[in-house]
């Protein structure tokens, strides 16, 4: 965050944040409201939500939704972390892909026909048409997402400029702590759910406010969220579904329904299920997203009605600093998308999916807490933060 501010000389900082489920197809550790507090305490001025219909998607759709929201908010610059760290290389890669589009598409098809996942086929196709010096490594997750951010900016004819910060020491998927002060999201998650884990083991890797809020969430609600806690719900749902039922679920394609229904029969945990389910053709992340759509009962028809090929249909405001509130007040008339401070009365197909996702997210809580949290989510107004006193209002 501090590096971003230093690089962009920004007046205000806006974060677009996923809701209950994330791009890798897994539940967020804590609710979006606690994560909003974390962001505000770390220097973000406006926190807005990326709807489920965009957030639990491949990089291209995820980026398209995020950029459309930032564009609507009249953001002048976007900054993202990447393994490459040189913004010129991203533009070079996009240019090469555009110039070699026919060859690129042919290679992707060729590698997919050989049994590779779309992500792997894309990465291999890039390796064949790009020289490594001035182009990015498209096998790296943050490079892929950054590439799609810039593509979305160009496709939406936005005047937004892009900047990138190089990720050091730790890669996104690293499962262990390889550095004294920098750790991957994956390694932090793994540590939090290990036996006899404590927050002291991750304190040197995350901001103090974040550690405090994580501990507070676990103390108040008795748990952090991961896939294993939803597995009994997930397995029950699958055991009551037919292949035809499953084919209606978003991202269930090419006979995947039969493999899912076969592997669930003998799986006693989500991790074991995923180990049995994964193939060369389907990445772990792609399968986790499909599982998330099964859990939330998100159908192809619902995603079609949400019209995700276009921009996000609204801006759900989750939190703001005093500076962020001033920015919104000054620019409100210029912002074309409706800004939602709660969702109780707003109606849209995208929001229907969102409500289901929230219901599922809180399903692991005991009653009456579960019902209270779900009701509160729809009526919850944006969290306000006074950055001069470092206090929530």
Curated annotation (Swiss-Prot):
A Pfam family that the UniProt record links to this protein: HIGH_NTase1
GO biological process assignments: tRNA modification
Record field: catalytic activity: cytidine(34) in elongator tRNA(Met) + acetate + ATP = N(4)-acetylcytidine(34) in elongator tRNA(Met) + AMP + diphosphate
Binding site for ATP: 81, 142, 167
Molecular functions per Gene Ontology: ATP binding; ligase activity, forming carbon-nitrogen bonds; tRNA binding
Disulphide-bridged cysteine pairs: none
Domain of life: Bacteria
Major enzyme class: ligase
Cellular compartment(s): Cytoplasm
EC number annotated for this UniProt entry: 6.3.4.-
Coiled-coil features, chain-numbered ranges: none
GO cellular component: cytoplasm
Keywords: ATP-binding, Cytoplasm, Ligase, Nucleotide-binding, RNA-binding, tRNA processing, tRNA-binding
Transmembrane segments: none
Chief place where the protein resides: cytoplasm
Family statement: Belongs to the TmcAL family.
Function field: Catalyzes the formation of N(4)-acetylcytidine (ac(4)C) at the wobble position of elongator tRNA(Met), using acetate and ATP as substrates. First activates an acetate ion to form acetyladenylate (Ac-AMP) and then transfers the acetyl group to tRNA to form ac(4)C34.
Name of this chain's protein: tRNA(Met) cytidine acetate ligase
Classification of source organism: Bacteria, Bacillati, Bacillota, Bacilli, Bacillales
